[in-house]
């Protein structure tokens, strides 16, 4: 009787690379170590590109949540969003609001009205958001603007930039402008918890140039990590608001 020779190629390269990052964030409290900025960026890119397996991605997201992301890890992931997402510009200083992508369920969000007041006064406003996503499935920025008669979803980056130039208002909509990130949404539903990506979404702005970044937080440790991460990312004008 003969036996087939075992495969020699082994697991795909991306999965092997990802194992090293998973070991770092998934070990016990005495052996777990943080990723460098570059490693965190690479880990996120492997997830966005589907180079890591679904099991690896789920394990990484929940382990990272339990351990809590370190500032340089958030900065590394922010580097990826900055590179892959749209880059909007204005001829004058702008303001960008970092809002929860999974929306609101218990409070009435006023930031669409705030954005309209600011833009009508000539201050460019850049917002980022997505469709309804786990775990809250709250009302989203694009839905709120639609209620006011502004259809901001389903638009090209060129259209968004043109309206920012003309009206001082822009909404970057993840399904349209950062579709790679949409591939990670089902994991939120399966895990039942918000992964560190939710913290990343509060720190990201698509605006390039001088701006004030307003970011919300709930827990004080989250605020401290956000400040350090944004400082590493070169953000010099930041305002954090509890519960925003």
Stretches found by the model and what they are:
Residues 155-217:
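Phosphate/diphosphate-binding glycine-rich loops and adjacent basic-rich segments that engage nucleotide
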Residues 60, 145, 201:
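Residue-level signal for inorganic ion chemistry
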Residues 61-65, 100, 141, 205-213:
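Active-site-proximal beta-alpha loop/turn segments in soluble metabolic enzymes
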Residues 1-107, 119-121, 125:
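Acidic, glycine/proline-rich low-complexity segments that act as flexible tails and inter-domain linkers
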Residues 9, 191-244:
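A structural signal for small-residue-enriched, beta-sheet-centric alpha/beta enzyme cores
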Residues 33, 103-104, 129-130, 153, ...:
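Glycine- and other small-residue-rich loops at beta-strand/loop junctions that grip anionic moieties
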Residues 90-95, 120-124, 128, 140, ...:
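Short coil/turn connectors at secondary-structure junctions
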Residues 92-162:
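A generic, well-ordered mixed alpha/beta core segment in the N-terminal half of proteins
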């Amino acid at each position: 009787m003969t036996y087939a020779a075992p495969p020699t190629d082994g697991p795909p390269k991306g999965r092997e690379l990802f194992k090293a990052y998973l070991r770092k964030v998934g070990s016990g409290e005495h052996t777990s170590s943080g990723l460098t900025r570059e490693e965190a960026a690479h880990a996120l890119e492997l997830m966005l590109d589907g180079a890591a397996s679904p099991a690896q991605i789920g394990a990484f997201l929940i382990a990272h949540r339990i351990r809590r992301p370190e500032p340089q890890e958030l900065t590394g992931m922010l580097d990826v969003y900055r590179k892959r997402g749209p880059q909007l510009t204005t001829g004058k200083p702008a303001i960008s609001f970092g809002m929860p992508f999974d929306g609101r369920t218990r409070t009435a969000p006023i930031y669409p009205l705030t954005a309209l007041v600011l833009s009508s006064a000539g201050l460019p406003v850049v917002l980022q958001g997505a469709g309804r996503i786990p775990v809250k499935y709250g009302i989203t920025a694009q839905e709120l603007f639609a209620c006011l008669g502004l259809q901001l979803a389903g638009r090209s980056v060129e259209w968004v930039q043109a309206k920012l130039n003309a009206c001082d208002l822009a909404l970057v909509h993840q399904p349209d402008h950062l579709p790679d990130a949409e591939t990670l949404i089902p994991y939120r539903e399966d895990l039942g918890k918000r992964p560190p990506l939710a913290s990343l979404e509060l720190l990201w702005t698509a605006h390039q140039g001088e701006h004030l970044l307003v970011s919300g937080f709930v827990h004080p440790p989250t605020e401290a990590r956000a400040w350090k991460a944004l400082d590493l990312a070169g953000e010099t004008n930041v305002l954090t608001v509890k519960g925003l």
